[in-house]
Amino acid sequence: MKQNILFYLIALLFFPLYEMQAAHQPEFSTAGFYELANSGREVYSMNPAWRFHKGAATGAEATDFNDRNWKMVSLPDGIEYVPTEASGCINYQGEVWYRKHFTPADELKGKKLFLHFEAIMGKSKVFVNGNLLTEHFGGYLPVVVDVTDALNWETDNVIAVWADNSNDPSYPPCKAQDVLDYTYFGGIYRDCWLIAHRPVFITDPNFENEMAGGGLFVSYDKVSDTSAEIILKAHIRNDSKKNFKGVVEYELQQPDGTQAAFLNDVIQVRPGKAVTSKDKIMLKSPLLWSPETPTLYNLIVRIRDNEGNVVDGYRRRIGIRSVEFKGKDGFWLNGKPYPSPLIGANRHQDFAVVGNAVANSIHWRDAKKLRDAGMKVIRNAHCPQDPAFMDACDELGLFVIVNTPGWQFWNDAPEFAQRVYSDIRNLVRRDRNHPCVWLWEPILNETWYPADFAQNTLDIVNQEYPYPYCYSGCDSEARGHEVYPVLFTHPANADKDWAIKSLDPKITYFTREWGDNVDDWNSHNSPSRVARNWGEQAMLIQAQHYAAPRYPFTCYDVLCRTPRQHVGGCLWHSFDHQRGYHPDPFYGGVMDVFRQPKYAYYMFKAQRSPEKQDRLFETGPMVHIAHEMTPFSPKDVTVYSNCDEVRLTYNKGGKTWTYTKPATKEGMPSPVITFKDIYDFMIDKNMSMRKKKQDEVFLLAEGIIDGKVVATHEVRPARRPEKLLLWVDNENTDLKADGSDFVTVVAAIADKNGNIKRLNNYYVKFHVEGEGRILGGANILANPAPVKWGTAPVLIQSTLKPGKIKITASVLFEGSQMPASAVLELESKPAAHPFIYTESEAALIPMSSDSPFGQSAAKSASELEQERLLKERNAQRLKEVEKQQADFGEKK
């Protein structure tokens, strides 16, 4: 381990901090905190280099078990890579084993050492050096293990994890995957950390199992623009053999580092005991958190002994806000009525190829893309999601409905309910300090549970969060819903068969899922369920269905017309995702499994405010033409924009049309704009072939506010496919060299001017050189990858070494007249935390896919230049062919 820590420090010297911060770089918590320098608390990534076996393996917990033939993986790991169409239970369910070899560094001696698995799917057992240290049931919450006395020094240690994602009715969610509307996937699919600190320390709330306690608990009261009370609790344990006397310090810093408050609390902790420090900050003129201004303070907590030495400490990002649900008066934020319905979407975290084994950066990018689209609330479907996603929502201003795991299943066995109750307690303990938490949803999704269960779950949330601004929601159809302050239902101004029949003035209402519209719950045909590659017509219908269909239905427009008592709704669903009980994925996302946008995404974007602000997410005016100018494109041209006016121009010197937004304040902020009977392919043909004015054919939309053009979007017909384009979809975030992080690189088929050719059926093969690897191979159609709606994405993962990565993309079957290859170079940056692994083990991590068909040779600069010159020569030769075809073709 020593040499790996040294490499980490050397890397920081070669990649200075200022280079890493050219753009905003998100940071992610570890076990609920952010590391604080010189605190005596260190965080090590345990993600690299685990040996993996799919299936049963008798005796695999033993230190001397022979695992030399096992596959080498790094965490997060989802057991297997899957195709983009991975529904219908094609994924593996069953036992798996992981084994990690390492030798702990001497500097860890004498410290408390905790293994923190953010989640392990299914039921699991954790062994260290052959000893069973813990057993866990459930796949979405932390598994924390005290390994202080389990390690051996100056020799090889083995952590062995057994996990099983098989159908099991004894713990939630419990529903068998073949009758489940999502997919469990499997493995150790989130991060694993080793937390090291001194024997006097701030505890982990998910390890301590103390009601409304353990760790750090930050809550608020009397929040307003002028002042706020910040209620502080810190649970301190003394595992040393001496009495401890000292202080707990709380330092509150504004985002710019300015100290906003400081106080301390004297503590005394006897050996083997724990105490809770309680204090309160009275803050004047607080910078309040909201979706529009998600201001985060840094709360630094330190334990000092009587000599002033720092014994333990860490940093926590907090947002000061109040949330109140006031029945007929609706939702109030920070002491004021919130001015509009909160509209957002549900989110499963699964991603193309990797399933649920998603890198932290992807969680941040997901949140960023949703916030860019103007969404303000996300419902975690149907489980606590990765801590990295919660961190991102804090930073980007997304409210979150936090769900306990559960979906249409109840088991009368007492152990089942107890495990549900345990999950609720642990999700509150894990997420209680996040300002993004809007509602707790402790009931089981769409489940016929006993009536007393609803009361019990509400009581548990209130026990675990006994402070102001804590609210829970429940389905209006569920047994026992009467005790809940927030009920989920459809609004009365939509489909009246779905809406609640009478409103209680004391209750606040919200639509937890809207937008899906199946013909029946077996076929699952719906105008909302549209694969991106089905093209313009299908995507236009989906976007209109979500915006304002011509039939009674809960849609964006309807939700904007509700009384204050109905406070918004979450679309089902943000992204396409995999399912167990149906052969088709859910295609109803506004983005696909790679997070490539459909037209509906831009419809959502058009609903955000046109006011430009300095934020981490996109703000300001926008305009988007939902039309590709193909021979099959509709005559009507659809545009999405949040501007007051939109001017559409068809061709250079051609006609223009102007749309003016209605003055009414009712309904969705920006209705879908349709310019009727505009596009004509024959006009394109006439301009292009007969008049030789291809460059003058286009659609141009200009967004206008106060008479000024503030946003534009131009679309041109894609001509002959000439080349590939490559770009990285990273939201300007760095690729971290931690062996786990990955980024989406997109190849597109384009004409000579870079216009994407949406209609083609090529395959693209990728080759990577340097410090990166491709995730997935030909066996799952990841590499080579089919081109869908003009693009073929691939996932590029970092290695453990920062450095350059070169990606080459070519069409699978190359020829002198096929599109030219493209090259893209990336550079991975140093990881945020040092690693623990054995060098010889890490060297066995595969650098390429195990599918030989997916391997393409790298192209040298000279080969690429030859390709370019050949394309130029061919273009000249083709001009003669084109002329002769024109001479013998139609003249009129």
Q: What kind of region is each of these model predictions?
A:
Residues 28, 32-36, 56, 93-209, ...:
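Accessory beta-strand-rich segments of carbohydrate-active enzymes
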Residues 152-156, 233-326, 824-826:
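Extended acidic/polar, glycine-enriched regions
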Residues 108-111, 151-156, 243, 283-296, ...:
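Short glycine/proline/serine/threonine-rich loop/turn segments at secondary-structure transition edges
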Residues 232-236, 302, 637-641, 727, ...:
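Beta-strand-rich structural segments
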Residues 41-64, 80, 120, 180, ...:
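Substrate-binding clefts and catalytic carboxylate motifs of secreted carbohydrate-active enzymes
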Residues 77-104, 108-129, 134-137, 168, ...:
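Active-site-adjacent substrate/metal-binding segments within catalytic domains
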Residues 364-369, 377-600, 621-626:
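Substrate-binding/catalytic cleft of secreted carbohydrate-active enzymes
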Residues 147, 278-288, 672-694, 783-800:
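Short, hydrophobic beta-strand segments
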